[in-house]
């Protein structure tokens, strides 16, 4: 749990290091944003916010949780683990026009490749594959693990319905939960 929390915090801090300075430089444009939350990383103090608990669609930010849980399960064993692509990994995305790496049913993919594809190409089929890996069987099992992690972290305004972030009514988070 500590490794997952540390990895998740590192990813969020890196995202914040890129996004927050740009937002600060933008000045008044931030006031036109639907929701934002700027938190002191050392103290947890909310420095500025607007609608910080409003439940919004997280899109591909969802993959931060997906990647975090996959990394936690792997515990550094990146190269030896092979994942087998299932029918669900590929065909659950049919008709979504989502980003993918064209995985083929039955294909064996090294864990490290699935991690890179999900992180760098925002591959939704890669996110599905990772969810099956850390969930222990199906994408639904992976999503259940994601929501268990949400509960453990005390994220009151977050719920996942998939591992990739494709829009769904029951898939939401708040900027405070993400901070």
Go through each PLM region and give its residues.
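Sec-dependent N-terminal signal peptides of Gram-positive bacterial secreted proteins and lipoproteins
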Residues: 4-24
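Acidic, His- and aromatic-enriched active-site or binding-groove loops in soluble protein domains
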Residues: 179
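Active-site-adjacent loops and short helices of periplasmic peptidoglycan-processing enzymes
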Residues: 25-176
């Amino acid at each position: 749990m500590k490794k997952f929390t540390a990895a998740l915090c590192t990813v969020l801090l890196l995202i914040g290091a890129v996004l927050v300075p740009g937002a600060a430089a933008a000045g008044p444009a931030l006031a036109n944003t639907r929701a934002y939350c700027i938190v002191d990383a050392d103290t947890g103090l909310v420095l500025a916010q607007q609608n910080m608990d409003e439940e919004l669609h997280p899109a591909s930010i969802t993959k931060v949780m997906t990647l975090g849980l996959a990394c936690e399960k792997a515990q550094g064993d990146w190269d030896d683990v092979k994942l087998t692509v299932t029918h669900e990994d590929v065909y659950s995305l049919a008709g979504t026009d989502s980003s993918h790496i064209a995985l083929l049913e039955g294909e064996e993919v090294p864990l490290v490749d699935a991690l890179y594809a999900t992180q760098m190409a925002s591959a939704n089929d890669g996110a599905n594959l990772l969810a099956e890996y850390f969930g222990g069987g199906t994408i639904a099992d992976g999503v259940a693990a994601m929501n268990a992690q949400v509960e453990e972290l005390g994220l009151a305004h977050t719920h996942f319905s998939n591992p990739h972030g494709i829009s769904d009514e029951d898939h939401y988070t708040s900027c405070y939960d993400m901070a």
